Amino acid sequence: MKFSELWLREWVNPAIDSDALANQITMAGLEVDGVEPVAGSFHGVVVGEVVECAQHPNADKLRVTKVNVGGDRLLDIVCGAPNCRQGLRVAVATIGAVLPGDFKIKAAKLRGEPSEGMLCSFSELGISDDHNGIIELPADAPIGTDIREYLKLDDNTIEISVTPNRADCLGIIGVARDVAVLNQLPLVEPEIVPVGATIDDTLPITVEAPEACPRYLGRVVKGINVKAPTPLWMKEKLRRCGIRSIDAVVDVTNYVLLELGQPMHAFDKDRIEGGIVVRMAKEGETLVLLDGTEAKLNADTLVIADHNKALAMGGIFGGEHSGVNDETQNVLLECAFFSPLSITGRARRHGLHTDASHRYERGVDPALQYKAMERATRLLIDICGGEAGPVIDITNEATLPKRATITLRRSKLDRLIGHHIADEQVTDILRRLGCEVTEGKDEWQAVAPSWRFDMEIEEDLVEEVARVYGYNNIPDEPVQASLIMGTHREADLSLKRVKTLLNDKGYQEVITYSFVDPKVQQMIHPGVEALLLPSPISVEMSAMRLSLWTGLLATVVYNQNRQQNRVRIFESGLRFVPDTQAPLGIRQDLMLAGVICGNRYEEHWNLAKETVDFYDLKGDLESVLDLTGKLNEVEFRAEANPALHPGQSAAIYLKGERIGFVGVVHPELERKLDLNGRTLVFELEWNKLADRVVPQAREISRFPANRRDIAVVVAENVPAADILSECKKVGVNQVVGVNLFDVYRGKGVAEGYKSLAISLILQDTSRTLEEEEIAATVAKCVEALKERFQASLRD
């Protein structure tokens, strides 16, 4: 919103300069976006009168004038403006004057005729872009007066950003109220003398939508001169607020809008058939707007109609068929309170955003309509003449907004502000804000003023008291609290440490939605019931996730569709599993999951182009598990999972309890999700891993290690992990390392069997092992494998 600083100072004039005023307004919560002078920098321009005006003898478009500027003689000035005429009061730049752009006025000859100055237009003085003619001043403008003084051009336009909750500041009166409160000054409102009815003319008014229009005032004014010029003082105030003068009737309604914040509209009374009906539009009803466009109305749009047709969109835009024109003699002034909910969104639906809709959407003072009607009537009659009829008031008290009664407690005020403000000061602030205040013991009862819709709860009053008291006046006090060192168990494994490891391995962390597409989730977890949202964002986001895989796989598809074929991502977050034994019937588990697909390495001339496989992901997962210190207790077991490839997946067990899965996505699921190529996933229940085993210091043997290799033939269904585990168990203290380095199937090995080549590392911490001891330990391992797995040594 833009307004003139001088106009504001007519209401309240604090003894501070423009910069301090702008800062004060900003600190009050109305952010000042800019302060600009209303005119360019110039001097030497005075009010003059054109005494004579004749045609230039040598130029058809020029005139030779004699101008009285209050000196001892008339000035000869050549002028090319089409509106220059005898008797006109004008702005005269005399010799020696300097206009904007450092343009100096000198004596000159134009087409042979002397010119001792210049008759100025608004654009030449940097006041506006209007360069259609010279400035026409009122006939009573005092000759010789400095034009800056006469037009009050030592003024600024202040532009503020008004937040949606402060609709009361969409008029000069609202800003003035705040400035008056902040400076503890009285508000000087212009005297609004009621205009008594001098005629009996009225129009019948019916309000069929009282919820949308709780109050509607109408008044007939007859015999106006719509062609009467708008006074220069009003034009200037409108211009400085960014509004162009149109005609006297429209200018008056715009003036009241800017001054009081109350939108108004004027209908041509003679074009209204029957009377006024305030109703909701009929489905498909049309209205030709003032700009000539046709709007197709919806049934939820409020309209002002006569007995035959819609005349205007209520609170938004007028209609062409009832608008004021050059032939208008009788008008109906409308001043109403429309409910914000009945206006919100309707203007945007038709590509409109008007000053009226901007205010009605945020809320207009429901007690303002009488004052605005009297103000507009007085201005209209003073400018255009005419006679006013009685004010017709249709009010539905039941649907008018009620003023909120709020209790402010001393304890709440002190706690939220952190500073004690004296009781009498709090009372004074609330009363200056317009509240009706009743003091109690350690509390205040405040009835909010009608113009403050945003005062509804106790915190609103706390904010107002702090704002008016001044945030800068509240002392800075450091927070004081006892500092207690938190206990930290060495066994606690931070999830951040795991994320860092995965980052180092080339994974990127992602965060996906907790609500997913139930159809996709059923593909991954067929037959498992999920928690459905009663009011989802969309059908595709209507179920709470049972695992992190749903979001991660969708992220892979998203990236593959954008030519990102090598993907390595992970996520930590909650899954939501229905469980009748859990609180509220839902169990929330913290999970860690990851996905890889594409090439094993980034593209490089010296690296083979190989696709990731099961063992790539299993290796990364083992690195994570190694951080827990429990890797030796983890087992990977072949176990079916409907989302995973039956031959390339495993369940992950810790001390006999399943804690997750790892494997290749099932080919059928891969096809349904449009995954491009082999995709591998893992998921772990993090809470079952977070309690790590603290590493224990062990003595490093100074004696040589010995390696012995054996190859055993076992049945195809015997897991290699069980073979390695048995060797570790049998070897006790001497076997310090067991590793599978080859798997063979083929010639020499019966069908249904496989050959596992295993290396045994033997070492003692106190002595060098003898060959006989080594051989005995190896034999013991072989014997144990024969007994448990029916293994045989391969020749």
UniProtKB/Swiss-Prot annotation:
Complexes and interactors: Tetramer of two alpha and two beta subunits.
PROSITE patterns: B5 (PS51483), FDX_ACB (PS51447), TRBD (PS50886)
Lineage: Bacteria, Pseudomonadati, Pseudomonadota, Gammaproteobacteria, Enterobacterales
Major subcellular site: cytoplasm
GO terms (BP aspect): phenylalanyl-tRNA aminoacylation
Enzyme class: ligase
Gene3D superfamilies assigned to the protein according to its UniProt record, in alphabetical order: 3.30.56.10, Bira Bifunctional Protein, Domain 2 (3.30.930.10), Ferrodoxin-fold anticodon-binding domain (3.30.70.380), Nucleic acid-binding proteins (2.40.50.140), Phenylalanyl-trna Synthetase, Chain B, domain 3 (3.50.40.10)
GO cellular component: phenylalanine-tRNA ligase complex
Pfam families in the record: B3_4 (PF03483), B5 (PF03484), FDX-ACB (PF03147), tRNA_bind (PF01588), tRNA_synthFbeta (PF17759)
Its EC number(s): 6.1.1.20
Name of the gene: pheT
Binding site for Mg(2+): D454, D460, E463, E464
SUPFAM superfamilies: Anticodon-binding domain of PheRS, Class II aaRS and biotin synthetases, Nucleic acid-binding proteins, PheT/TilS domain, Putative DNA-binding domain
Catalysis performed (reactions): tRNA(Phe) + L-phenylalanine + ATP = L-phenylalanyl-tRNA(Phe) + AMP + diphosphate + H(+)
Subcellular compartments: Cytoplasm
Keyword match tRNA-binding: yes
Species of provenance: Escherichia coli O157:H7
The tRNA-binding domain, residue ranges: 39-148
Keyword Aminoacyl-tRNA synthetase applies: yes
Alphabetical UniProt keywords: Aminoacyl-tRNA synthetase, ATP-binding, Cytoplasm, Ligase, Magnesium, Metal-binding, Nucleotide-binding, Protein biosynthesis, RNA-binding, tRNA-binding
GO molecular function: ATP binding; magnesium ion binding; phenylalanine-tRNA ligase activity; tRNA binding
Name this polypeptide is given: Phenylalanine--tRNA ligase beta subunit
Required co-factors: Mg(2+)
Family to which this protein belongs: Belongs to the phenylalanyl-tRNA synthetase beta subunit family. Type 1 subfamily.
